[in-house]
Each structure stands twice: as C-alpha cells, then as structure tokens.
Amino acid sequence: MHSQFDHVSVVKKSNVYFGGSCISHTVQFEDGTKKTLGVILPTEQPLTFETHVPERMEIISGECRVTIADNEEHELFRAGQSFYVPGNSKFKIETDDVLDYVCHLEG
C-alpha cells in the first residue's frame, strides 16, 4: 500500500454524503482511472451506499463493519484490508472511530 499518489489531478469540490458523515475527493489518474479519498466519521446507524461500477474499498486507518448487498452478516475490516463491492449493488458501512479510505473505482 503506497502512502501517496503521484501525477494526479484532484477535483477541488468535495463529495459530501449523509449530512457530512462521509466526505471524499475524486482523484483522476493520467490513464483515466479514478479513485476517491475519503473519511467516514463515527456513525450511529449504518450508511448505505449504492454502486454503479465495481468498487474496491481500501481501509487506510480505523476499522469498520460492512454488509455487502443483501447479506445479513457483517464483516469487520481494519487498516490495510480491502473489500470488494460489485457494480449495480450496495453496501452498508458503520464505524465507531474516524475511518480513512480509498475507493478504487474499477469500472
């Protein structure tokens, strides 16, 4: 896991979800790929995100509980781990601490 991205463009306007509980910025690479760098603040209820393209969520710091699609069981992910969500799907995520992540948009 690299600690920085080089040779990128960053969209200055932030993506704000759930009243500010999740904030990210889009990073565009020279080859046209995109990622978002974000933070999720502690949540009392799971946040539900819908995907349009496949996404790989890389946890940079913190830990979270994730439920993918219609699964009933959640999984715990910590810094250094990733989880994959298919396109045209959804996932629920919740955290008790500040969570830093990179969302790799793979579509």
List the model feature ranges, each with a label.
Residues 51-66:
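Short, conserved beta-strand element in jelly-roll/cupin
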Residues 86-107:
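Ligand-binding loop in jelly-roll beta-barrel domains
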Residues 1-37:
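A short, N-terminal "cap"/entry segment at the start of jelly-roll beta-barrel domains
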